[in-house]
Amino acid sequence: SALQAVVMTGVHSAMHGSKAKPWMQRTVVSLRFQKNWKPLYGVETLQPLGHYDEASRHVWFTQERLANAADTGTTTNVGVGYRRIVANDDHYYGGNLFYDHRFRGNHGRMSVGLEYVSGIGAFRMNWYRGVSGERSLDGVMRLESVSNGYTAEYGTSFKNARWARVYMEAYRWQLRRSEDKHGLRIGTELQLTP
């Protein structure tokens, strides 16, 4: 809607304009409205711990996110990570530790991740562990729980088309009351506007 566009233009200008503080430039805010003006929003920030500049070869960082989505409700993610850039700047590697919380159902999980990025290719692996027990959805029959599992993904863009990316992801989720869910996803992402 027009109101939504005006609000987001103002937010973007304040967060990323010439007078914005460095921490604001590492923060992304999104806002949309559903029917009856019900908001969908997200705030995500990535902040270095300690000194970090263009000459730095490694960085410890925190990453926080708060979002409200139509299908999951309000969620928050809090994490810490490390990245090391090699001397010739052509690749980096790192790891992270996160806690995710979904307020609907009061569910929580921990995750540990590793990544290796070289040029146009990237490999990422994440392991997930539920830290909340089963919860009743309706007080009687339907139960819900956080599944343990992992995802492993390799993706690449193209030298002359950085706006296009293809990826392959393997996953396995351990389900409590049925067979484990596992598979392979192959997909593409296209950034059609800059």
Across the structure, where does each feature detected by a protein language model lie?
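Intrinsically disordered, low-complexity, charge-dense segments enriched in Lys/Arg
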Residues: T151-S157
